């Protein structure tokens, strides 16, 4: 049996912030000869995305409990029990040597099933404040890791696994050397866009005139509206796209980013070495604020809570940053990044796997 490849089951679903780091670790271990399967749900993004990466996926039926009403809460124990039974049956068939929980509702029943079968459970928390599933699973996990300090008091800080093309970008002092002309501002609202960015940044452009050039990802279905907003204030020259397929190229182009502060976005911006203005999405638990705080504390970014994200405040901030200041911020961002996060997570998975 010693010649058999090790087996990993990745448990992650729902959003790219959970799925993409899991894929990075999966590919790293597959390159070392590991067999990897995925545990997810059939109605979320992992169902389509994971098979495209050459990884087989098994599904269980589970969804979130927040905001579902009294009936859903009363039915929750039965739903969780059924999902646990499904996950347990899947793991009995695949016989993983270790499971890796990257977040999302699927990790709860999956982690409990693995624990009940004596399979080591490794958790990775991507956000600066722990999600409910990981808070609960941490009590039974073999190892807990975190991307940012503070999610768990005693967990090792390992960063977030990010895409290799972002990690391959030249260092800020190389990439930004010799640049002049207008400051290049990359505006990213995530794949869904962000209304506050779409409404505010054209007005900022009007204030700053030819001192900036903007590349603005608007999100789905509103590209024309945002283009009209720029044109309406006499700034039609700025580039508006619905999506940006090659984020590494966009980061390489930019001098500064204006964006939400999802966990992966923050980690990618740090890895690329870019200054940022972060506008945290207003979650109840302020998850995105806590993600961005380490970069602000390092002098690499400025956080504007949404009510403070005004035309005047943003325009004044951007106007106040010289190229020299932006380079210093970029170097600080890169200095606090953890570029070997994928290797750190994979190493821990290997360490605790059953022999």
UniProtKB/Swiss-Prot annotation:
Residues that coordinate or bind UDP-N-acetyl-alpha-D-glucosamine: 15-17, 127, 163, 191, 244, 263-268, 288
Annotated keywords: Cell cycle, Cell division, Cell inner membrane, Cell membrane, Cell shape, Cell wall biogenesis/degradation, Glycosyltransferase, Membrane, Peptidoglycan synthesis, Transferase
Molecular function, one GO term: undecaprenyldiphospho-muramoylpentapeptide beta-N-acetylglucosaminyltransferase activity
Reported function: Cell wall formation. Catalyzes the transfer of a GlcNAc subunit on undecaprenyl-pyrophosphoryl-MurNAc-pentapeptide (lipid intermediate I) to form undecaprenyl-pyrophosphoryl-MurNAc-(pentapeptide)GlcNAc (lipid intermediate II).
Membrane topology: Peripheral membrane protein
GO BP field: carbohydrate metabolic process; cell division; cell wall organization; lipid glycosylation; peptidoglycan biosynthetic process; regulation of cell shape
Reaction catalyzed: di-trans,octa-cis-undecaprenyl diphospho-N-acetyl-alpha-D-muramoyl-L-alanyl-D-glutamyl-meso-2,6-diaminopimeloyl-D-alanyl-D-alanine + UDP-N-acetyl-alpha-D-glucosamine = di-trans,octa-cis-undecaprenyl diphospho-[N-acetyl-alpha-D-glucosaminyl-(1->4)]-N-acetyl-alpha-D-muramoyl-L-alanyl-D-glutamyl-meso-2,6-diaminopimeloyl-D-alanyl-D-alanine + UDP + H(+)
Primary localisation category: membrane
GO CC, alphabetical: plasma membrane
Top-level taxon: Bacteria
Protein name, as recorded: UDP-N-acetylglucosamine--N-acetylmuramyl-(pentapeptide) pyrophosphoryl-undecaprenol N-acetylglucosamine transferase
Similarity-based family: Belongs to the glycosyltransferase 28 family. MurG subfamily.
